[in-house]
Structures are given as structure tokens and as C-alpha cells.
Amino acid sequence: MNKAYYIGLMSGTSMDGVDAVLVDFAGEQPQLIATHTEAIPSHLLKGLQRLCLPGNDEINRLGRLDRSVGKLFALAVNNLLAKAQIAKEDIIAIGSHGQTVRHMPNLEVGFTLQIGDPNTIATETGIDVIADFRRKDIALGGQGAPLVPAFHQQTFAQVGKKRVILNIGGIANITYLTGNREEVLGFDTGPGNTLIDAWIQQVKNEPYDKDGAWAASGNTDQQLLAQLLSHPYFSLAYPKSTGRELFNQAWLEQQLSEFNQLDEEDIQSTLLDLTCHSIARDILKLAPAGELFVCGGGAFNTELMQRLAALLPDYHLDTTSALGVDPKWAEGIAFAWLAMRHNLGLPANLPAVTGASREAVLGGRFSAK
């Protein structure tokens, strides 16, 4: 059988590394051939975190980081190919998400901005790059996010089965597959790992709360949880999307200003409950029972999964592994899929999810030649 090799590149709002996946789309289901994670060097990570907040000299910093992130993404590709022992000539295209530094679709003239220069990636890998997937959807009046529901629909939908696919990265998003293959809903529920990561990084200088152990050692403060859940985003109707612009360290510090007496682990437990409660509320609005499959980094947080299961007793909870897709690499596979859709001239957004006026072919092509 002929191969249809594409590479997907993803770095999410967690900024915990560049995930690179090699996927074969020749069969009915995507086949994951090889994976690689390229760590983000600390100086680059600090620069990206600064760029995500308003500041001075932003254009110079943006230009430099755009190229630097492009070089890092190219390094991820070259290391992936070396690991897989596959030649660049065998790859049809790379689908690069880039690194989001602003996502503000609800302004009068909404926009989203991802960096990681695709020209640099194409030049340094010798492979054509499909990138800038979100802005076409925004140009059509959409949110530009989430984009993974179209991939979830094609890969996970089954006639007669009500399924929720929950992707927990920095931000959490859900795809509701109604059991009718044509009908799908999806949106960002709010914070996924972004606040629990930020708090443990600030207090303990650890990158993330492994297995949710620190959160499990604390007790949730119901007053703080109620205050956090009163954020207007949680009561917005979908289509909706969000990011670090709303849920960031500055917002968290503002929320904690009246709760100085709380133990640090109690704050961590409360932040984990914010993630779980906001997700569960939105899922229950869609359907009282069904199947729930989790992917993204949150799928590996034992405490998170247990709390979610307790809030959704009538859902069968599992990871996307049960459906044949490794939860760690699901989003990278989705961007390889988006590159394939572009290459075939096929639409990849879902207007019911993003609010765009129509379906569209997403992304632009950046030639290696």
C-alpha cells in the first residue's frame, strides 16, 4: 500500500515542548509512525511568556521569536526524521500549528497570532509546510478555535454513539459527537492545565503537578472556587474560545488577593477543581450521559481524571487510547491531518463549532523550494 506521510507540529498554551508526530494517512484511520518532543530552551520559554503579556518593544521581540521558534520547530522535525529513519523526500507536507502568543477573536476586528516562521521550517527541513490554520476561520467571522473537532469527527464519530472528546492542554476543549455523523459541537471550556501548572511553577518551581499529587494533598476552598467560576467566560454561549489572555498568572494573583490565608496546596486543589467543574458543567449541558474520552496532558493527571469521573457519574470515562489514538499525541496528529486536508483542497473547519460563515480550506503553503 502507498504511504501518505505527513508531520504534525504542536506547541500548546502549556508551552511544555514542541510535539512532532509522523503520521501515515494511507489507511482508513491515521497510523502514528514516530513521535518526538523537543524541549523549549528556558531563554526561549521566558521570551514567549513575556510576549504573551502586554509590554514594550513587542514588535522587535515578536520578530526575533518568530524566527527562533521556527528554528526550534525545524529542529523537532529533523530529530523526528532521524529517529524514524525516514527521508525528508518521503514526507508530503508538515502541518505546523505554531505557538500562540495572542488569541483575541472577540474584538471588533478579532485576530489570532501564532509564531514559528513557516518559511524557516520549510528552509531548514527541505519539506513544504502548511501553517497559519486559524486566521481563515477568523476572516470568515469565526473564533479560529477549536480546530480539532473536525479531526475528532472524522476519527472518533460512530453512528448511534453519543461521545464527548475532551482535549486537556493548557486550555480544555470539548467535541460533542451526537451519534449523527453530520452533527458535531465543540468549544473551549476554559482553563485546562494552564493555572495548575502556573501555580506549581510559581510556588515549587516544578514544571507540572505529576499525577495531581500536590492538588490531592490539599482541600478545595469552596468560596474561592465559586469566585473563580463566576468569571463571565463560563456563562458565555458557544461558539467560544479562550486562552492565556483571560486565564493567566496575573488574573490568578488578582483572584487570590483576598485569600492570603489559604495553604498553597489548598489553592492547587481549588484550581484543579476549577478545571474539572468548568469541564463537567459544559458536558452536562450537552448530554446527561454518554462516553467521554480524554486526550492531551490532562489525561495523565490521575487526580484530575478521578475528580472528573466523580462529577460525571453517568459517563463512561476513558482516554482516547481506547479508540486507537494515543492521548499524548492526539493534537499533533490533528495538525498533520489539517495539513493533509489542505493538501487535498478539503475544508477543515466546522462552522457549528467556530461560528465561521462557511467551511473553508485552512492554512497557507510555504514551499521548501
Curated annotation (Swiss-Prot):
Reactions catalysed: 1,6-anhydro-N-acetyl-beta-muramate + ATP + H2O = N-acetyl-D-muramate 6-phosphate + ADP + H(+)
The protein's annotated pathway: Amino-sugar metabolism; 1,6-anhydro-N-acetylmuramate degradation; Cell wall biogenesis; peptidoglycan recycling
InterPro entries, alphabetized: Anhydro_N_Ac-Mur_kinase, ATPase_NBD
Binding residue positions for ATP: G12, T13, S14, M15, D16, G17, V18, D19
GO function term, MF aspect, one: kinase activity
Keywords: ATP-binding, Carbohydrate metabolism, Kinase, Nucleotide-binding, Transferase
Gene3D superfamilies for the chain: 3.30.420.40
Documented EC number(s): 2.7.1.170
Biological processes, Gene Ontology terms: 1,6-anhydro-N-acetyl-beta-muramic acid catabolic process; amino sugar metabolic process; peptidoglycan turnover
Pfam families: AnmK
Cited function: Catalyzes the specific phosphorylation of 1,6-anhydro-N-acetylmuramic acid (anhMurNAc) with the simultaneous cleavage of the 1,6-anhydro ring, generating MurNAc-6-P. Is required for the utilization of anhMurNAc either imported from the medium or derived from its own cell wall murein, and thus plays a role in cell wall recycling.
Alphabetized PANTHER family for the sequence: ANHYDRO-N-ACETYLMURAMIC ACID KINASE
Family membership noted in the UniProt record: Belongs to the anhydro-N-acetylmuramic acid kinase family.
Record's protein name: Anhydro-N-acetylmuramic acid kinase
Species annotation: Shewanella sp. (strain MR-7)
